Amino acid sequence: MERIKELRDLMSQSRTREILTKTTVDHMAIIKKYTSGRQEKNPALRMKWMMAMKYPITADKRIMEMIPERNEQGQTLWSKTNDAGSDRVMVSPLAVTWWNRNGPTTSTVHYPKVYKTYFEKVERLKHGTFGPVHFRNQVKIRRRVDMNPGHADLSAKEAQDVIMEVVFPNEVGARILTSESQLTITKEKREELKNCNISPLMVAYMLERELVRKTRFLPVAGGTSSVYIEVLHLTQGTCWEQMYTPGGEVRNDDVDQSLIIAARNIVRRATVSADPLASLLEMCHSTQIGGVRMVDILKQNPTEEQAVDICKAAMGLRISSSFSFGGFTFKRTKGFSVKREEEVLTGNLQTLKIKVHEGYEEFTMVGRRATAILRKATRRMIQLIVSGRDEQSIAEAIIVAMVFSQEDCMIKAVRGDLNFVNRANQRLNPMHQLLRHFQKDAKVLFQNWGIEPIDNVMGMIGILPDMTPSTEMSLRGVRVSKMGVDEYSSTERVVVSIDRFLRVRDQQGNVLLSPEEVSETQGMEKLTITYSSSMMWEINGPESVLVNTYQWIIRNWETVKIQWSQEPTMLYNKMEFEPFQSLVPKAARSQYSGFVRTLFQQMRDVLGTFDTVQIIKLLPFAAAPPEQSRMQFSSLTVNVRGSGMRILVRGNSPAFNYNKTTKRLTILGKDAGALTEDPDEGTAGVESAVLRGFLILGKEDKRYGPALSINELSNLTKGEKANVLIRQGDVVLVMKRKRDSSILTDSQTATKRIRMAIN
């Protein structure tokens, strides 16, 4: 009070007022504050008083030659006085106007190339449609979103190297461009930016926008792909939203979307194979998305989705430390727990062994359509605050939280037996058994949970067992909030391990992910996904399996032929024949296999019965475990197009049609490729011509190793001996001639000698 009184007295004296308003500031501390460092302390004020001056801009001396002293209106454009402390000229803002109107022009051809991201944004906005504005409460939650549409996915370091290579190619410094994408981009950009006059720094900035994904942690309600985020300020406010449809798609969003679909398909397929982890890796390495190897995309793309993260873990990449349960991402924010096995009884008196988490913990739960905060103790839910788009989404979150809490009343609410299995027909673990059970029907769970009266808290209401809102009562411990729960913002990645069955654990041994968590949602990928692995042939149905199997045999016929005659068992066990088995009626599989294997053995034993087309046609049937029986078949059935189709043992059918004239194979009307060698009998002439320069010594001699194909003979050195597979599956021993003069006689004698050697 004393001080205020003192100040009032001071202010009443006219001298004080004069000092404060009229005199210059000469206090050292104040002068220091505003003059130390290069950083402007009050930019707005500085701008105002600068622009009030006549010549607020400084320019290089050369400006005096390039700009007249006065403009058409006779206003002065620059002052003859030098800028204090430098040898630059003081220039009026009018000079800028003059320059813009009358200054030199330059080629604009590079602008759309350098400012590509801006030009594309304008196009998207031009073709986008803005709908009506709705006023309603916006449940926004902060999510990590992609800010700049149309970027490649290089790491900051990779991009830096590319930018240096393109913009400053002559700068010193070690730069090694390793990845495929780096090399392609560098080549493309160098070509585009030849003779570009835009300042290199600007070009570098713009390239960075194009090459690196920029993410921000922003409050979003609605679409999270980058083409929505770029108009976030136009589409959602605190209490309003504007409908918007983007006027174009960008590759980075398409890559994210297609990557998720590919990863889900691969995880689902791997789950049902004999060695899920090995199969998953094989598929990831042989799959391309939009022409880029999936493993390259996985290394660079930060998308966090269950299937994508399982693939990353398998490749030894780090992933987020949050874990997944029931399609929600859980992140522990407080507390800790220890795990202990406990046996519990369901309402149906079935015993379940569950891993109980003992201790107090708090979690955030984030799903696509609902979010929640969960506080729990050992086998007890203390509080669940949930928010979601609609009743259905809120119910989903409540079920997941109730199961996760492991409360006794939840386990006692089970009616009937729990026997859910995964795609590979293995029983699910108890927690997922419970989850599936209540996801099917949660009525009993909600009825048995119990309700409690609630206090009136701002922004929170109760929810009843039938999922209707209430201000008086609510499910015990559960409240519905208007506010969403933010996604976990950290981008920290941790080292994880993965087991054979694709369960991903952190270094403390907690399971973060498992195939049960992979969504069953099917979507159409935006970019072409090319699965080269035979395990993915099934994805497009039985027809594709049939066509792909025969295409594979034809493509690899050279090696298949040798294996057929020498190591048939190895050939029958090839994984490429696995998908085919699902087409053969279960009851007939082993009978067909026994029949075909016997037939093949006869072909190997009896001269001249080798028939290329027939071997190709019947080979996939021999892959099943055979049953030794005397059964003969004139046709074999495959289940395609919803019914059984016959493949004739001798002759053509719609399911397998070989045209002798064109030498092409057609499967169900689709071209499956051409046979490069002549599959007709008695074509010894061809071989004798090829065998010129070789002396035929006699029957096959095992000491000289496995049989070579005719194409491989050229690798022999003079005088070297080898077994060679000729004609229709017969093997003879040959030696490469030491002299070239006798080559002519070879073709006549070859034919005779082949006959002798075989007989």
Curated annotation (Swiss-Prot):
A single GO molecular function term of this UniProt record: RNA binding
Pfam families with a match to the protein in the record: Flu_PB2_1st, Flu_PB2_2nd, Flu_PB2_3rd, Flu_PB2_4th, Flu_PB2_5th, Flu_PB2_6th, Flu_PB2_7th
Gene Ontology biological process terms from the UniProt entry: 7-methylguanosine mRNA capping; cap snatching; DNA-templated transcription; symbiont-mediated suppression of host gene expression; symbiont-mediated suppression of host mRNA transcription via inhibition of RNA polymerase II activity; viral RNA genome replication
Residues at the site labelled Avian adaptation: E627
Protein's cellular compartments: Virion; Host nucleus
Keyword DNA-binding: no
Motif range (Nuclear localization signal): 736-739
GO cellular component, one term: virion component
InterPro entries registered for this protein in UniProt: Flu_PB2_2nd, Flu_PB2_6th, Flu_PB2_C, Flu_PB2_CAP-bd, Flu_PB2_middle, Flu_PB2_N, INV_PB2, PB2_helical
Domain of life, source organism: Viruses
Keyword set, alphabetical order: Cap snatching, Eukaryotic host gene expression shutoff by virus, Eukaryotic host transcription shutoff by virus, Host gene expression shutoff by virus, Host nucleus, Host-virus interaction, Inhibition of host RNA polymerase II by virus, mRNA capping, mRNA processing, Viral transcription, Virion
Listed HAMAP family: INV_PB2
Family to which this protein belongs: Belongs to the influenza viruses PB2 family.
Subunit structure: Influenza RNA polymerase is composed of three subunits: PB1, PB2 and PA. Interacts (via N-terminus) with PB1 (via C-terminus). Interacts with nucleoprotein NP (via N-terminus).
Chain's role: Plays an essential role in transcription initiation and cap-stealing mechanism, in which cellular capped pre-mRNAs are used to generate primers for viral transcription. Recognizes and binds the 7-methylguanosine-containing cap of the target pre-RNA which is subsequently cleaved after 10-13 nucleotides by the viral protein PA. Plays a role in the initiation of the viral genome replication and modulates the activity of the ribonucleoprotein (RNP) complex.
Protein name: Polymerase basic protein 2
Native source organism of the sequence: Influenza A virus (strain A/Hong Kong/156/1997 H5N1 genotype Gs/Gd)
Lineage of origin: Viruses, Riboviria, Orthornavirae, Negarnaviricota, Polyploviricotina
